[in-house]
Each structure stands twice: as C-alpha cells, then as structure tokens.
Amino acid sequence: MTKKKKSILSDQRFIVLLVIIALSAVFSFMSKEFRQYTTILSMLDFSYYDLLMAIGVTFPLITGGVDLSIGTGMVCYALIGGTLVRSNNVPVVVAMLLCVVLGIAIGALNGVLIGIMNLPPFLATLCTCMITRGAGSLCSATPWPTLNQPGGWFHSIFKLTIGQGRSASRYPLGFLWMILLVILMEFVLNHTKFGRYTNAIGSNKEAAALSGINVKFYHVMVYVVCGLFTGLAAIAYAAVTPTVQPGTGAGLEMDAIGGVFVGGVAASGGYGSVVGTLVGIFVIMLLKTGLPYVGLQANWQQIITGVVLIVAVLIDILKEKKSAH
C-alpha cells in the first residue's frame, strides 16, 4: 500500500465520511420513512445552526480553548432580534445584523477575559453562558415573521420554495451556503496568517509568543470569529424554528462541540479542519435524526452520541501517541 493511500485511510475525516455512509445505509434499510425527501430536508434544516456554531467554535478549540456560551448565546440573540421585530417593528434585516453584532460583542468579551485577563476558557465562557441565558430569559417566546408575512423573506435564504400548496417544491438552499462557508473558512484556517497563527498557538503558546506572534490579540480574535458564527447561527435558528423559546439553548453547544471533535480536531489543540467539522456535524445530525426511526428515543440518542464522541477523542489520543513514537 502506498504512503498516499495509507494517509487517506488514516485521515479521520475519511473515516468519519465512511461512518456517515454506513449510518445512512443502516437507517435507510431499517426505515423507509428515513429515505423520504422531507426527512432529509428536515435534517438539513436543523443542521445549519449546529454547523455554524461548530465552524465558529473550531477556532477556539484549535487553540486549546472552548466556548460554552454558543448555545445560549444563539438563542439569546434570536430572541432579542425577534422581540424587536415583533414588538418594535424593527426591519428584519436590522434584527439579523443585530444578531451578528451581539455575537461578535460576546465573542470579544470572551476573548478579552481569556486572552488578556487570562481566565480559564471553561470559566470565562461559563460566565457568558449564564449571562446570555439570563438575558434570553428576559424575553418571551418569540416567533419571527413566517414566510408569507412581511419580512419573512429571510426563510428563503435557507429553504427555497417554488410553487404553492401541495405542488410546491422545496430546495435546501442553505446547504449551498454552508458548503461555501466551509470552503471559505477552510481556506482561512490553512492559507492565511490568522489560520496559521491559530494552529501555532494551539500547538505551543509559549513558542508562538517567542516567534513574534501576538498571542493575546489572536486569542481575542478566535473568540470574535466564534461569536460572529454564533450570530449567524441565531439567524439560521430563527429561520428554521417556528418559535424561539427561552431556555432552549442549554445543551445545544454540546452537539456543535461534539461534532468538531468527531471531525478530528485535536483534543489538546494545535490541529483542526473545518471540512472535518462539517462531516462531524453530519454524524451527529444523522444520529439525532435516524435513531428515532429505529425506535431509540432521546435518552438513548444522547448515550450513543456520547459514546461516539468518546471513541473519536480516544482515536485522536492514540494517533498522537503513535506520532510521538
């Protein structure tokens, strides 16, 4: 076997892609409902905000950090934006921009707490998680405008509907935007100074500082990027969820973070891939969507997802030990 073939077969992204194919085959065989177009469309709808959060949190995880505020933050921004649209007649486009601005602001706060004030990432983002959860709880349940209402056009960003009634055809336009974003952020991670410095800080922060990298600045920036994508996730969440409910963000960050680790980000930092994040999120979404079709309910879904995450992290640890030897 050539070195190139060995490299492909040992690439965790390739392994996870095989897992996606295997899971799809198993669920399709066990349930004909799983094969329906509406099921696939629904799975894609609810993967958009998970993927956006996951793309953002990939960068702090590569530096050896984490952001626990992305789930509650996403719901908080969607609630604030929706409340302004419903109660204050703020244009939807302004509310969408506000979601992004709020995400960047909380991301910058996380970055300052971690990168400049040297708080542990877990503690700093746990604090902002509590802040955003509390701020979101001050708002009531908020439906954004639906597709047939003024301002409801933003739903078409993620799902294009052609025709009316039963003859209407729906296309997952959001999937195209997700692929383009993955390509863009993979390029940023691998071919820009920001991406190279992010990897360098995760590999060895002290060595990165000695080489002239402004570690504090780039630590702040990875959390700003994470906040930006959390704000975008808030828009996607509002677009696919009929009503944004306070308190629903708790735990959503686990799917995003889990998908990043399944996709091959190093448990200790220093390496990651946005393409890997994409395939990792699809494993999580396949499990969440497919397991109910084979008779396994929510508790079992969480258990199996947890086991998959443990296996992914163990594989990464074994690979690190093997490369060290």
Q: Model-predicted segments: where are they?
A:
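Hydrophobic core segments of alpha-helical transmembrane domains in multi-pass membrane transport
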Residues: 16-28, 57, 100, 129-134, ...
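Membrane-helix/interface signature in polytopic inner-membrane proteins
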Residues: 39, 183-223
